[in-house]
Amino acid sequence: MVGTLDEFRSQLIGGGARANQFRVEINNPPAGAVGLDTRNAAFLCTAAQLPGMTIEEIAVPFRGRSIYIAGDRSFETWAVTFYNDTNFAIRNAMERWNNSLNHLVTGQGLTNHDDYTADLKVSQLDRDDRLLKTYTFVNAFPLSVSAIALTAGGSADIETFDVTFRYQHFVTDGVIADAPSGPF
């Protein structure tokens, strides 16, 4: 139980991690001629997530009751939101990557897993832009590139779109000495 405001404040190390202090690194896959400007993608990324993970449960029936044991691990997809600039640089690159998996017209695509996947990263930063923790998404590829909503309603908003990636697993690197790190 929290005693006083000062005790609470002393437990909130670094003033708390801030949701707007992050950096993403989207790398090009070896094949598919994606041509993504990775620096531009890092700047124009407006939203990302630190990943989630789940251990499935296995129900084992025994005399009218179930005992639950840990099952397989599963990982959620990873979604990133980008601002769309007027040359569509990031959008075009994501469409090329997605198209290299299954061509819009021919239905053909890259079949060698190592040719169409790349490692991607999201890092939590502190308020001085120092790394607190980095998640590396291993062997990622884009599952979907979202639609961009257009409207004649007079809004002056900059277009955004989401890219959802599937990956095999993630690895963490904690900069803080006490933080556990390693593959998950």
Report each predicted region and the residues it spans.
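Glycine-rich, low-complexity intrinsically disordered segments
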Residues: M1-F184
